[in-house]
Swiss-Prot record:
Species name: Coxiella burnetii (strain Dugway 5J108-111)
Keywords: Ribonucleoprotein, Ribosomal protein
Function description: Involved in the binding of tRNA to the ribosomes.
Family listed: Belongs to the universal ribosomal protein uS10 family.
Molecular-function GO term, any one: tRNA binding
Pfam families, per the entry: Ribosomal_S10
Protein name, per record: Small ribosomal subunit protein uS10
PROSITE patterns: RIBOSOMAL_S10 (PS00361)
Quaternary structure and interacting proteins, as annotated: Part of the 30S ribosomal subunit.
Domain of life: Bacteria
A GO term from the CC aspect: ribosome
Amino acid sequence: MSDNQRIRIRLKAFDHRLIDRSTREIVETARRTGAIIRGPILLPTKIERYTVLISPNIDKDARDQYEIRTHKRLVDISEPTDKTVDALMKLDLAAGVDVQIELLNKKSGA
């Protein structure tokens, strides 16, 4: 790959154990191929809360509360080699983890 490119990997999952395991696998795979890693960077957890009335008729005080937590991680791979890209493509991650991969150009001043 070109020297002025880097790979940014964003991971999302509802279960923090799955996302941590997947992040660890990505970092170990990239390090084995000789790439430079920045991260994993923990991004803010998005919490969505829902309140539902239990009683269909009266008693508005009876409610249940639910929440969904979306955990996010970010991994930057600088100076990726062709071996790095091949190893990342062959990597088998958990089904509950959403992976977004971006190919970025490094800025000339950074």
